[in-house]
């Protein structure tokens, strides 16, 4: 059972909650959309905005509804106390307003998401989103007063003392300024304000102390005036509800010196007025401020008034003084003893608990028969004649430890547990347990004639081999003609060749899967390959052969004097055919210069990378003031920064 509500989350105002949810939507959802995008993408963009905003509002509303206690589920004391402090109907209406707003926000989001599914353009979807968020904001602004009220209730609930209605409790009550708070400060460490004027205590204060290793709580209640309940204010009603609902020992304080501002007659009259609230409670009347006046110093009329209090059953009068702490601990201890005794008495009165205990300790006794014959215990004669065990007797009955000692003692002798088996035949005791396979006993499937069956199978195999049942296909081929055999072998060779070609083609396709295909113009083709291919197609290659021979004779190299003068040697002609050198290493003398060049290139790329440029030609200038964050009026009056 919850006793304190200090962990309720803060309830923001309507404007603050609106800012929180809309800022969260702006931060956690995409912000860029173009009219050229697909219409499905535009719809999804704005539907996400509406759904995300709805989820933000619902999350905030759920925190409020789950944080505050349900006034119908708490203890009656806390329920009446909250009704007195916060007005129960107002509290329920405020929470109901929040719950209704949650339902309305969900309905708005559902309706506008349905409309956004059929949006025809970016402008139309944007206006629908704007209308949805606007309606949610309107619903939120209508919660201005309930949210302010709930925040005040939350703050006050967090300051309420933690009062356990079911623990051991001493309840201090009486007129104002009779010494209730002073007594609480004397018996506990509670820091209660004490002043010489009335109504210093305006709420319930709780202090704790230990008595006989048990934890007690003492509650200081505000002062009560003798008037009808309908005329009492909220301060007095807190005391009334505490007396009515808490199982405790009530300490009714009185001031005989009348320095509190109320006469003895008024204090006695107040006791009789609230006496119906003391039902099923132990009550003590504590006369305080005995350092000023004692009961013996009163006149007979006032003493008779005090004696009238004793007419209430179980009431005991004690005296004390909180100034010099006279008899303070005695009053506390006496109240604790009365409380413990009453709690034990209430437990014993509970019939259910007593019945459960009696059922546990019930002992059954046999009843005598109708004939009245005395039936004594029967002991068999064989048991009476059993010879007592004597370790020194050589003819004694051997025990298990005697057998163990004869066979080497503990750690050497291994007892056979199967000797204790109770079977029809003692020869079965040491039988080997059969194996179980798939839930069946393997021994049940063993055939005693298995050897004879095996011999029969072997004879049948020999007969089949003699009849040629297992002859191979090679023997059948030997009986065929040579032409048929040759035809079969050619077909088999063709099939094998076809399979190899298919495998090679598949490997080629797999090898070229992630590589560039060499263009046909770059592939080297010799004249002999072309001649062989054209001949296979049936073309006459004699004309091409003569042209090839003439071209080869013309290009045959002969060195002349001009070639020597102008340097047209073999190396100059074949320079273009040589393998080109690595351009990355051209102009670099050694590895140290290569490393230095790499460092300088990396240094020059640093600034470009810092500016997030794609390359040296990237000159794109991004917007320094994003329009969606800085558009709108910024006047002196109301402004909209969205």
UniProtKB/Swiss-Prot annotation:
OBG-type G domain residues: 168-340
Keywords per UniProt: GTP-binding, Nucleotide-binding, Nucleus, Ribosome biogenesis
Coiled coil: none
Disulfide feature: none
Domain of life of the source: Eukaryota
SUPFAM superfamilies linked to this entry: P-loop containing nucleoside triphosphate hydrolases
CDD domains tied to this protein: NOG
A single BP term in Gene Ontology: assembly of large subunit precursor of preribosome
Pfam families: NOG1 (PF06858), NOG1_N (PF17835), NOGCT (PF08155)
Annotated region described as Disordered, given as residue ranges: 585-642
A GO MF term: GTPase activity
GO CC field: cytoplasm; nucleolus; preribosome, large subunit precursor
Sites where the protein binds GTP: 174-181, 220-224, 288-291
Localization: Nucleus, Nucleolus
Main location: nucleus
Feature: compositional bias, Basic and acidic residues: 609-621
Gene3D superfamilies, sorted: 1.20.120.1190, P-loop containing nucleotide triphosphate hydrolases
PROSITE patterns per record: G_OBG
Function: Involved in the biogenesis of the 60S ribosomal subunit.
Stated family: Belongs to the TRAFAC class OBG-HflX-like GTPase superfamily. OBG GTPase family. NOG subfamily.
Protein name: Nucleolar GTP-binding protein 1
Organism, as annotated: Eremothecium gossypii (strain ATCC 10895 / CBS 109.51 / FGSC 9923 / NRRL Y-1056) (Yeast)
């Amino acid at each position: 059972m919850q006793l304190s509500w200090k962990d309720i989350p803060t309830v923001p105002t309507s404007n603050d909650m609106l800012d929180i949810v809309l800022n969260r939507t702006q931060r956690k959802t995409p912000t860029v959309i173009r009219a050229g995008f697909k219409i499905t993408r535009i719809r999804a963009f704005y539907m996400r905005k509406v759904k995300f905003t709805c989820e933000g509002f619902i999350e905030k509303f759920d925190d409020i509804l789950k944080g505050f206690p349900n006034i119908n589920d708490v203890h009656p004391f806390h329920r009446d106390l909250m009704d007195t402090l916060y007005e129960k109907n107002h509290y329920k209406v405020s929470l109901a307003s929040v719950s209704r707003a949650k339902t309305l926000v969900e309905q708005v989001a559902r309706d506008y998401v349905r409309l956004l599914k059929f949006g025809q353009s970016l402008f139309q979807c944007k206006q629908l989103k704007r209308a949805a968020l606007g309606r949610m904001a309107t619903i939120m602004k209508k919660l201005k007063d309930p949210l302010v009220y709930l925040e005040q209730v939350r703050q006050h609930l967090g300051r309420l003392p933690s009062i356990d209605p079911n623990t051991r409790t001493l309840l201090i009550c009486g007129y104002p300024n009779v010494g209730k708070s002073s007594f609480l400060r004397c018996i506990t460490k509670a820091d209660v304000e004490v002043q010489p004027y009335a109504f210093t205590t305006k709420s319930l204060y709780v202090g704790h102390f230990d008595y006989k290793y048990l934890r007690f709580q003492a509650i200081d209640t505000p002062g009560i005036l003798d008037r009808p309940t309908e005329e009492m204010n909220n301060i007095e009603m807190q005391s009334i509800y505490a007396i009515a609902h808490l199982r405790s020992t009530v300490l009714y304080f009185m001031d005989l010196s009348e320095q509190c501002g109320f006469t003895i007659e008024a204090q006695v009259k107040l006791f009789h007025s609230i006496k119906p609230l003391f039902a099923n409670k132990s009550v003590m009347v504590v006369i305080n401020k005995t350092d000023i006046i004692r009961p013996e110093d009163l006149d007979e009329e006032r003493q008779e008034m005090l004696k009238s209090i004793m007419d209430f059953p179980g009431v005991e009068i004690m005296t004390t003084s909180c100034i010099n702490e006279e008899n303070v601990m005695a009053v506390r201890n006496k109240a604790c003893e009365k409380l413990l005794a009453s709690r034990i008495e209430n437990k014993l009165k509970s019939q259910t608990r007593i019945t459960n205990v009696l059922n546990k300790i019930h002992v059954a006794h046999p009843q005598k028969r109708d004939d009245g014959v005395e039936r004594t215990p029967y002991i068999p004669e064989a048991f009476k004649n059993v010879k007592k065990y004597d370790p020194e007797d050589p003819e004694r009955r051997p025990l298990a430890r005697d057998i163990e000692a004869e066979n080497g003692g503990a750690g050497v002798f291994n007892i056979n547990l199967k000797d204790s088996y109770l079977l029809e035949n003692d020869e079965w005791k040491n039988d080997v347990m059969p194996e179980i396979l798939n839930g069946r006993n393997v021994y049940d499937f063993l055939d005693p004639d298995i050897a004879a069956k095996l011999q029969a199978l072997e004879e049948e195999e020999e007969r089949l081999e003699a009849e040629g049942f297992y002859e191979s296909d090679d023997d059948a081929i030997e009986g065929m003609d040579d032409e048929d055999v040759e035809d079969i072998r050619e077909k088999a060779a063709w099939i094998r060749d076809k399979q190899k070609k298919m495998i090679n083609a598949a490997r080629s396709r797999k090898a070229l899967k992630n590589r560039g295909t060499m263009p046909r113009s770059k592939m080297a083709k010799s004249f002999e390959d072309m001649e062989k291919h054209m001949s296979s197609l049936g073309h006459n290659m004699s004309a091409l052969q003569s042209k090839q021979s003439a071209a080869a004779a013309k290009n045959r190299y002969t060195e002349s004097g001009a070639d020597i003068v102008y340097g047209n040697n073999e190396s100059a002609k074949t320079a273009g055919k040589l393998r080109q050198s690595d351009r990355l290493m051209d102009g670099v003398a050694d590895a140290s210069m290569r490393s230095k060049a790499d460092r300088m290139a990396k240094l020059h790329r640093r600034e470009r990378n810092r500016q997030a440029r794609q390359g040296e030609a990237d000159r794109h200038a991004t917007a320094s003031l994003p329009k969606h964050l800085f558009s709108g009026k910024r006047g002196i009056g109301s402004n909209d920064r969205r």
